[in-house]
Amino acid sequence: VLDNTDLSAAERQPPLQADWKGCLADRDQPYDASSEPAGILTSRFVAAKCHVSSLAQMEPLTTDLEAIRTRAQSMTPDGYTNIAIGYTMGLATLRANSEFGSAAATGPNVKKFMIVLTDGDNTRNRWNSDAASIDARLSAACAQAKTNAADKNVTVYTIRVIEGNEALLKSCASDASKYYNVTDASGLQPVFKKILESIQKVRLTS
């Protein structure tokens, strides 16, 4: 469910129920820190005009690795950094009852994982460009995820590439061992290998 009542006239798009092809912006606070499905009007996802045309489209959950590779390769560094919206939307896609697809329901035989990767500090959200206030919204999202029944069963890995708030990203990981600091882009492949190995280990021993 999308809403656009809090955007400027130039940014507003007609309210739609599902088939939105534009961009999404932060939800009204405090829902911007939550992955919960939209309910009341102020919790709805905001249909926003895309200010950067090169942004890659979100890829639904899939087992098609080639589709994932293609989508990843289509990404280009542009625009601002808003880790909080990526964090909450990522968790939302892993919910069985979300607007984003058909994830399996949480259960003893279902393991869910999310990797948050960033190469910079928060620079802009829907309201301002104050890094400290945006960091606070990300911190709120991470804290809420660790207590929410649906989200706390998701194992979250965070990866800081060269730049970013190290303490904040570490706190957003499920635990300190799932935070990785990469000082050069060439170090990403070994990190992803470690993460894959840890996921496979969980799958084999659970």
Predicted regions and their residues:
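Divalent-cation-coordinating short motifs within acidic/hydroxyl- or histidine-rich contexts, strongest
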Residues: 1-112, 116-117, 121-155, 167-170, ...
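Short beta-strand/turn micro-motifs composed of small residues
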Residues: 118, 160-162
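Conserved residues at beta->alpha junctions
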Residues: 160, 182-183
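Terminal peptide-recognition signature
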Residues: 195
